[in-house]
Amino acid sequence: MMKNLNGRAHNVCYQPYYQQQLQHQQLHQQQHQQQQQQQQQQQHLQQQQLQLQLPYAAQYNQLQQQQLQYNQQQYYQQQLQQQQQQQQQQQLLRQQQPTQSAYQQQNAKQSYGHNNNNNSNNNANMARSNMHATTVAAVNANGNSHANAANANTATAAMAAMCQMQSFLSQQQQQQRQQQQQQQQQYSNNSAHINYNQQQQQSQQQQQSQQQQQSQQQQQSQQQQQQHLPTVATTNGDKLTLDSANEIANFLANELFMQQLVTFDGMQSAPTLTTPTLTPTTLRTIEDTIYELTTDSHVPFQAGFKPPPLTSLGNITNNNTITSTTAGGATLPGINANLINTNPQFDLIALNCAGSVPGSDTEESNGSWNEGQLNDDQSTTDTSSAATDSTSYQNGGHMMGNGSNGGVNNFAAALSGVNTSGRGSGLAANSTTSNSATPARRGGGRRPNKAANMSPEEEEKRRIRRERNKLAAARCRKRRVDQTNELTEEVDALMKKSEDLKKEIESLTATKSQLEYVLQTHSSTCQKVRDDLLTVATCNGLIGPTTLLNACNTSSVSLHNSNNSNNNSNSNDSSNGTITGFDATLNSTGRSNSPLDLKPVLIDEQLLQHIKHEPQDGAIDSGSSLDQDGPTPAKRFALPNIATFNASLQTPTGPAAGAALNTPISSTAPSSFAHFSSAISSPTLNAHALNKLPKPRPNTLNVNAQRPFGVAAAAGDGKAPPTQIQGVPIQTPSTGTFNFDSLMDGGTGLTPVSGPLMPTCSSQNKHPLELPTPTSEPSKLVSL
């Protein structure tokens, strides 16, 4: 035993070589057709010969046609009997479940019987030919009025041969029947299970054998009468009368009828005890041979094993309602009542097929199916595969297919139309669902957990609960789909927004890079310079007083350099644009290329009016800051004109020539600073103009037009040196001439040259407010 894909057990011998068996069957059918054609041709030739020789050809033709019709009727009856026997044998096989060896023995017996049948057919053909030859000889002998004794002797010999041949055929048929009975008894003894159905079948077979024996006895008596009549006619030796012709025709008809009793293709032959060599073509089962003759060779549903055929028996309406007729207390789905009445043997077969077969391979799968279960299972969607598997081999293979619908729905309609009341239930009809059945699903779904003792109320509750579960699952799926769609839409909106932001960022970045490029290209050709780039607080190229410079630097630093908390700038630092002590041309040439600030610097013209004048102590020779190399910031002012200076300069000529010069401190600004405010108002110089057209150093001393001090003194023109310069009185006790060394030793010509001064605490702390000013840095310039 093996298990197929659905898990059901089936015999190994059912489908070993199905295609080869089909081919073998087709070959047998072709051979049978050829034999029939040969027989018909021989009969046709014999008829032609008889028509040429016999004067009563028309009557013979009529008799021959009647004989052919009778033979056809007999053939159809034999076919029906064969089908009934095949169905009985199939039922026996399903009940007994024989093993492979039993099937092989049955096949061997059947093949041996087939050989015997072929031999009997050959003998019958030879006998028939001999009989025809004897009849022709008898006709020739009796038809001629001038026949001699030799012809009469040949006729008698022919009749004797015919009698011997008929006796031989009858003996051979009796031997075959005896062998069949013995083999059937042996087969029944070998089988392990004999039920009531087998006993009924044996009784039916015995009745059939008795009927056949009676018919054979009648035929033998008729043959003997036919044998005596021609002999009498031949002994008389005269012409053949109409009575003798009728007798000959009857003899031929009986002979053909006896030939029809011979089996065809070994279907009625019983198995023998001998076992020939098994080949793939001879290894087949009785069930296969039955299906080959009764069903179509092209089964539409094959899944690795041979399924039962979907034969439509009876009336099938369009709405898949299957009519059923009751016979013997059991329900027979789709069987016509006329067939049951005309064929009494078919009742037993139908009863056996309608009921469940004990001991079959589908008994365990049929145990969980009750009446009304199929419709309940079809109302749900999770039991389609199980229903297909468990009912595909139920009720002896008789399944009802839908005649109006083809294709896949035939199988589902057949499943839905199977009558499940074969265990004795008296249901009259079984209506199935609509044609919307789908093919079975392999895998998935729930197994049918149907209890045998479940009440209809429990089944209804289960159905309602399943319907509610289905609706709840559908709502859950819909809710999940809606939530997924909402989230998807939200994600799409956010993605779109992010893309818009990215595009905006890209556009702004491109605009920024474009503006930077334009700014870079414009900075090299821009004509505007920052106002405080080269701003110098100078008066005709020289630095003004300390108080004025402090005010200017404080205002410029507070406007442009807010990070400098001390407002302290170096005199040589060119970063703030203010240069102390240098010429503007020198500052412009030594300045680095820094970014331009185009903001204008506004300086109030009234700034000079708020300059605080601090008193100076005449006792201190040096400035307030002792660590400076140059003079004090208060003494950094523009020198007056040399001409006026020489006129007002008074140099005493005495031994005190090396004394320090005492320069009086004026409380008012010199007259040369009158135009300082105008110079302050426009202090910014154009860098490009300075670079391209160098401005000559401003000449504020007018040394070219005037004579120096020493020349004026040496000239001796009798004029006294000037005592004041532009309103500033000059009182110098020194009368000596200062050379370069004396000027570079620390004096500027305006202060008395004396020994080195030691710093004191009073000199350091006397003017603390001047320290954070830009002019408190030591000056590195030398006044000439």
UniProtKB/Swiss-Prot annotation:
InterPro entries linked to this entry: AP-1, bZIP, bZIP_sf
A single Gene Ontology CC term: nucleus
In-chain residues carrying the UniProt-annotated modification Phosphoserine: 594
Domain of life according to the entry: Eukaryota
Compositional bias of kind Low complexity: 97-106, 115-126, 198-227, 380-397
Region spans: Basic motif: 461-463
Location in the cell: Nucleus
Start and end residues of each stretch annotated as Disordered: 97-126, 196-231, 358-404, 421-464, 616-635, 759-784
Single biological process term from Gene Ontology: embryo development ending in birth or egg hatching
Region annotated Leucine-zipper, chain positions: 464-471
Record-level Gene Ontology MF annotations: DNA binding; DNA-binding transcription factor activity, RNA polymerase II-specific; RNA polymerase II cis-regulatory region sequence-specific DNA binding
Database matches in SMART domains: BRLZ
Domain bZIP residues, every copy: 459-522
Keywords of this entry: Activator, DNA-binding, Nucleus, Phosphoprotein, Transcription, Transcription regulation
Listed Polar residues bias regions: 365-378, 421-438
Family that this chain belongs to: Belongs to the bZIP family. Fos subfamily.
Subunit structure: Homodimer. Heterodimer with Jra. The kay-Jra heterodimer binds more stably to the AP-1 site than either of the two proteins alone.
Function per UniProt: Developmentally regulated transcription factor AP-1 binds and recognizes the enhancer DNA sequence: 5'-TGA[CG]TCA-3'. May play a role in the function or determination of a particular subset of cells in the developing embryo. It is able to carry out its function either independently of or in conjunction with Jra.
Official protein name in the record: Transcription factor kayak
Species this chain originates from: Drosophila mojavensis
